[in-house]
Amino acid sequence: MFFEIALIGTTASGKTYIADTLAREFDAVVLSLDSLCVYKEINIASAKPSQDDLASIKYFGVNLLSVNEHFNVELFIREYQKAKEFALARNLPLIIVGGTGFYLKTMIDGLSEKTLESKSSLNNDEIYTLLLNIDPNYKIEKNDTYRLKKWLGIYEQTREIPSEFLKRTQKTGVLKDIEIYELAWDKEILKKRIQTRTKEMLDNGLLDEAKILFYKFDHKLKALNSIGLKECKEYLDGEISFKDLENLITIHTTQLAKRQRTFNKKFQSKALEFDKALATLRMKFSIEK
């Protein structure tokens, strides 16, 4: 029968493995909420499910765009609606999985009224300084050009404090009363998993993937400045050694995992130790079925 769960966790926590295993065993549909897996050309850097997995499991949210195409959370809302419609029509469970917690939170909390991105010539530092003075409660990374321009666009068009405008115009979310499970790892063990995965990605051709991407596309594109690719660019430009490349990807991925862990505290989730996660979720799926 149809039911839905969300499976969250940091990068390298094993979310995809758990989701794919359950999908095969219970014929479940999977919606990926990952900001890199949406791109057709990024396979290794995104830790995208294998071609075999994508062929044997009904996936949504993967291989939707080219690297030079822009997207926002509305893309995932549309993919969720498609995935749910597909699963409901066939009476199948739906697993929502991904490390980009912002997308899941927006799907639960709802979107705010649309505004246009600012066309201002102000740079990131200037917009960020303005933000700190006007709207210090609005949390944006200093290097997030897209969200900074969106923030400035709201301020220019409404003359309201953007965080208050977004709260006032927020619509109902598409996800209701969904059970959320978070894969939990000891920090040191997770760091070792990240080290291992980094080495595997390099062994599997990450540098070759990066070469092709930087040859075909503008290196300033946001997707090409993601962890794994931006370090490859530095290596290919002769700025760092191969040893530095591996170390920097590991360090930056570990820092990302820390930020993800902090963000995931916003959810009312049930913690699952990885070793026990499959057994727990198998039991749930068996009962629901």
Curated annotation (Swiss-Prot):
This is tRNA dimethylallyltransferase. It comes from Campylobacter jejuni subsp. doylei (strain ATCC BAA-1458 / RM4099 / 269.97). It is an enzyme of class 2 (transferase). Its EC number is 2.5.1.75. Keywords: ATP-binding, Magnesium, Nucleotide-binding, Transferase, tRNA processing. Pfam families: IPPT. Catalyzes the transfer of a dimethylallyl group onto the adenine at position 37 in tRNAs that read codons beginning with uridine, leading to the formation of N6-(dimethylallyl)adenosine (i(6)A). Monomer. GO terms for biological process: tRNA modification. HAMAP family: IPP_trans (MF_00185). Belongs to the IPP transferase family. Residues 34-37 are annotated as: Interaction with substrate tRNA.
